[in-house]
């Protein structure tokens, strides 16, 4: 994921979450908001309840690779992916399948 495609600031996260537009499943919650840019900006959040820093960073790396495999970054959206505890209990393929399912739900809502 390129640097220009990432959401980092807390105010950007809050702006997207305040819209309350979301889709969710057992492994992820995705908050989204349309933007005026020609590309998507994506933020990943994994809470402290998920585990220690090593586990949280590993899950973020896995989510980034899932996003690189499945998501079209040329869409004009802000997206925040929140990782749930069930993510750790599943293997990569099942998490990938869950993320694809959420993207299909997101496409129906847009």
Model-derived features: positions:
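Positively charged, solvent-exposed patches that mediate nucleic-acid binding
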Residues: 1-110
